[in-house]
C-alpha cells in the first residue's frame, strides 16, 4: 500500500511539466486502452518492468485536485454519435472507460486477446479509485428503462468463446428470459451491429479488457461487449448520469442445465436493426432461419425430455406408472388386435349356431329325427361322427386340451398378455403350460388366473388359434390332411342329405349379408370358444364369420355377449337377432332388438327371401 501511495504522489508531481510531451500515435492508443482497466494497470506495478504508470504513461492525462486533497483522474471521452465531449471522473464505474476510450476516433484499440489474465489481478486500490461496498453498474446509452431498480451483486467477467449472434436489447425484461441456448453459429459479430447484446453460449478464461461484466439469467448468459455498447445508436434522451442507471440483479443459473431442451442447430439473427434514433446509419445484416420445420421435428427426443424438480406426489405417480407399465410393456400393439368396425356399418346380424345355422345337437339327441321322420339311429350316428371330428380338430390343432379349462368369451380377451413374440419356432409342447395348469389348477370358473409367465403362454395359444383359423377358414381340407379330408367331405354330404340341406339354406342367407358392405354377421353360441371355432371350420362357415365376430356365451351368457357387441359396434345401428332358443330371444328383448326365429326349413327360406328383397 505504501508503494501505491508513493506512486500516486509521483504521478501528481510529474504530470504538469510533462503534459505537453508528444507521443507517437500507437503509444497513445495503447495507453488509452490500458485506462479501460485502471485496476489492472496498478496491479502490474508490483513487478519490475510491468508498471504502466510511469512518466510516459501519464503524458496524455491530466490530474486535478478537487480541493480536498484527493486526486481525480479526468479522461476526455468522445461518444461515437455525438459531437459533444464528455468528461468522466474516476469515481464512476469501471466500465465507463471501456465504452468511451476504446471507440474514440483516432485510436486503434488493442485486441483483448493480447493481454493475459494473469497480468491483471483484480485487487482493490482505494487510493486510486474508491470502491463502494455495493458497487453500482452503470447502464449504457439508450437503456434507460432499468433506472432506479435495485443494485446488483458483483459479477464475474466471462468472455465470448463461441461465435456470437445478436439479439435485440430493447425490452430485455420480456425477451431475455425466453432466449434459447443454441450453439454452432457461423456468423460473426459486426462492429456496426448496434442496439444488440452479444450472446455466447460458452465460458472460458476471463479477459478483463473485453468484458468487464456479464449478466446471467435463467437458461442463458449474456456477455456485454464494450464495442457493442459504444456503438449503441439509441441516444439517451433523458441525459441520465451513469449513477442513475442501474441494471437489476439477476439470479445466476447454469447454462448447461437448459441446453438439452433445444436443438444445436444453426440459426442466424432474426431481427434487423435499421432504424436509429439519432440519424446514424446501421448496417446490421438480416439473417433468415436456416432450418425448416422438418428439421426441427426430426429430433423429438430433445424436446420431450423435461428435467423438472421432483415432488413426492410426482414420485408416487412415477412409481405407479412404472409398476403398471412393467406388466403391459410390449403389449400396446396387442391390446386391440381386432380391426375396428366399419364407419359405414348400418346393420349387424347376430346369429345363434346350433339348430339355427347347423343341425348338430338335435342329431345327437335324436330330436331332429323324431320331428322330421328320419331314422333316429342314423341321425345319432352322424351326430357322433361329427362330434368326434370336431373335438379331434380342436385337440390336434386348436390346443383344446390346454384351453378347455381356460375358456374365453372372445379370441382377443387374453391378447393383452401377449408380448408379440415370434411363434414360428416356438414349441408349445415343451413350454410347460399344460403341466402348470394341471398341477396348480390355475384356470378356475371363477376367473382366477395364473402368473404373468403362464398368462403369456395362454395368450400365445390363442394367438396361434387365430392364425390357424384365418389361414384355413376357406380350406379346412388342407388343415385336416388328405385322409381326414375325404372322411370329412363324406360326413358333410350324409348330414346334408339327412337334414334336407339345412346348412345350404342357412349359407345362402349368410352369403347375402356378407356381400353387403354395410352389414356384418356375428356369431354367439353357448358352445365353448375352441369347439365353436372347430364347428365353424368344419361346417364351412369361416367365410361368413371372421374370428373377431365369434363370441362364446358359456361363461357369461348371451345377454352379456349382446352387451359386448353393442359396446363394440355402437348404438346407432340396427341389430337383428336370429336364433331358435329362448336365451337369444330374451337377450334380444332386453336390448330392444328384433328377433327372427328359426324353427324349421320354412323359416330359413323366409329369411333368405327377406334378405333378397332387402326387407332385412
Curated annotation (Swiss-Prot):
Give residues where Phosphoserine occurs.
Answer: 338
Catalytic activity reported: O-phospho-L-tyrosyl-[protein] + H2O = L-tyrosyl-[protein] + phosphate
Q: Which tissues express it?
A: In the embryo, expressed mainly in the craniofacial mesenchyme, dermamyotome and limb.
Q: Where is the composition biased (Low complexity)?
A: 56-66
Cofactor(s) recorded for this entry are: Mg(2+)
At which residues is N-acetylmethionine found? 1
Per its UniProt entry, what is the enzyme's top EC class, as one word? Answer: hydrolase
Note down the stretches annotated as region Disordered: 1-66, 186-211, 277-345
Q: Which GO terms describe its biological process?
A: chromatin organization; DNA repair; middle ear morphogenesis; sensory perception of sound
The record ties this protein, via InterPro entries, to: EYA, EYA_dom, EYA_dom_metazoan, EYA_dom_sf
> What this chain does, per the record?
Tyrosine phosphatase that specifically dephosphorylates 'Tyr-142' of histone H2AX (H2AXY142ph). 'Tyr-142' phosphorylation of histone H2AX plays a central role in DNA repair and acts as a mark that distinguishes between apoptotic and repair responses to genotoxic stress. Promotes efficient DNA repair by dephosphorylating H2AX, promoting the recruitment of DNA repair complexes containing MDC1. Its function as histone phosphatase probably explains its role in transcription regulation during organogenesis. May be involved in development of the eye.
Family, as annotated:
Belongs to the HAD-like hydrolase superfamily. EYA family.
Subunit and partners? Interacts with SIX3; translocates EYA4 from the cytoplasm to the nucleus and promotes activation of their target genes.
Stated name of the protein: Protein phosphatase EYA4
- Tell me which species this is from: Mus musculus
What does the organism's lineage look like at the top?
Eukaryota, Metazoa, Chordata, Craniata, Vertebrata
Q: Which gene encodes it?
A: Eya4
Amino acid at each position: 500500500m505504501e508503494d501505491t501511495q508513493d506512486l500516486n504522489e509521483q504521478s501528481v508531481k510529474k504530470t504538469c511539466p510533462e503534459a505537453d510531451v508528444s507521443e507517437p500515435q500507437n503509444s497513445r492508443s495503447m495507453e488509452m486502452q490500458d485506462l479501460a482497466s485502471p485496476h489492472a494497470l496498478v496491479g502490474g506495478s508490483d513487478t519490475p518492468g510491468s508498471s504502466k504508470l510511469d512518466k510516459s504513461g501519464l503524458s496524455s492525462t491530466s490530474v486535478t485536485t478537487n480541493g480536498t486533497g484527493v486526486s481525480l483522474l479526468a479522461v476526455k471521452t468522445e461518444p461515437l454519435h455525438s459531437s459533444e465531449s464528455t468528461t468522466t471522473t474516476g469515481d464512476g464505474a469501471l466500465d465507463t472507460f471501456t465504452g468511451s476510450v476504446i471507440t474514440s476516433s483516432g485510436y486503434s484499440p488493442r485486441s483483448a486477446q493480447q493481454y493475459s489474465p494473469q497480468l491483471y489481478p483484480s485487487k482493490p486500490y482505494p487510493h486510486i479509485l474508491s470502491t463502494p461496498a455495493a458497487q453500482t453498474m452503470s447502464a449504457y446509452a439508450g437503456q434507460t428503462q432499468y433506472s432506479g431498480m435495485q443494485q446488483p451483486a458483483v459479477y464475474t467477467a466471462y468472455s465470448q468463446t463461441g461465435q456470437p449472434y445478436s439479439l435485440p436489447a430493447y425490452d430485455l425484461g420480456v425477451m431475455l428470459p425466453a432466449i434459447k441456448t443454441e450453439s454452432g453459429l457461423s456468423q460473426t459479430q459486426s462492429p456496426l451491429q448496434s442496439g444488440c447484446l452479444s450472446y455466447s453460449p460458452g465460458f472460458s478464461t476471463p479477459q478483463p479488457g473485453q468484458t468487464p461484466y456479464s449478466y446471467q439469467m435463467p437458461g442463458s448468459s449474456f456477455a456485454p461487449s464494450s464495442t457493442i455498447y459504444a456503438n449503441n445508436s439509441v441516444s439517451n434522451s433523458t441525459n441520465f448520469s451513469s449513477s442513475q442507471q442501474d441494471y437489476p440483479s439477476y439470479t445466476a443459473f447454469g447454462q448447461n442445465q437448459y441446453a438439452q431442451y433445444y436443438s444445436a442447430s444453426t440459426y442466424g439473427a432474426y431481427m434487423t436493426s435499421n432504424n436509429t434514433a439519432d440519424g446514424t446509419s446501421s448496417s446490421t445484416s438480416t439473417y433468415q432461419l436456416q432450418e425448416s420445420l422438418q428439421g426441427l421435428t426430426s429430433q423429438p427426443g430433445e424436446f420431450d425430455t423435461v428435467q423438472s424438480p421432483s415432488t413426492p406426489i410426482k414420485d408416487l405417480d412415477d412409481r405407479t406408472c412404472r409398476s403398471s407399465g412393467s406388466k403391459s410393456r410390449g403389449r400396446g400393439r396387442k391390446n386391440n388386435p381386432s380391426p375396428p368396425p366399419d364407419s359405414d356399418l348400418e346393420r349387424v346380424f347376430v346369429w345363434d349356431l346350433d339348430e339355427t345355422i347347423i343341425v348338430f345337437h338335435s342329431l345327437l339327441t335324436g330330436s331332429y329325427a323324431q320331428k322330421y321322420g328320419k331314422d333316429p339311429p342314423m341321425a345319432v350316428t352322424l351326430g357322433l361322427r361329427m362330434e368326434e371330428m370336431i373335438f379331434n380338430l380342436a385337440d390336434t390343432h386348436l390346443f383344446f386340451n390346454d384351453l378347455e379349462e381356460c375358456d374365453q368369451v372372445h379370441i382377443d380377451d387374453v391378447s393383452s398378455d401377449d408380448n408379440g413374440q415370434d411363434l414360428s419356432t416356438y414349441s408349445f409342447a415343451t413350454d410347460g403350460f399344460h403341466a402348470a395348469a394341471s398341477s396348480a389348477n390355475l384356470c378356475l370358473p371363477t376367473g382366477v388366473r395364473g402368473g404373468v409367465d403362464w398368462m403369456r403362454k395362454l395368450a400365445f395359444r390363442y394367438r396361434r388359434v387365430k392364425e390357424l383359423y384365418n389361414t384355413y377358414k376357406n380350406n379346412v381340407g388342407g388343415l385336416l390332411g388328405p385322409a381326414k379330408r375325404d372322411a370329412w367331405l363324406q360326413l358333410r354330404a350324409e348330414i346334408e342329405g339327412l337334414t334336407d340341406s339345412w346348412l345350404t339354406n342357412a349359407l345362402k342367407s349368410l352369403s347375402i349379408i356378407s356381400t353387403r358392405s354395410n352389414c356384418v354377421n356375428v356369431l354367439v353360441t353357448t358352445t365353448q370358444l375352441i369347439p365353436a371355432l372347430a364347428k365353424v371350420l368344419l361346417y364351412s362357415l369361416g367365410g361368413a364369420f371372421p374370428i373377431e365376430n365369434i363370441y362364446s356365451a358359456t361363461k357369461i351368457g348371451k345377454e352379456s355377449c349382446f352387451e359386448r357387441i353393442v359396446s363394440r359396434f355402437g348404438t346407432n345401428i340396427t341389430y337383428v337377432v336370429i336364433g331358435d332358443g329362448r336365451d337369444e330371444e330374451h337377450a334380444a328383448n332386453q336390448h330392444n332388438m328384433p328377433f327372427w326365429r328359426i324353427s324349421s326349413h320354412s323359416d330359413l327360406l323366409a329369411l333368405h327371401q327377406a334378405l333378397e328383397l332387402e326387407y332385412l
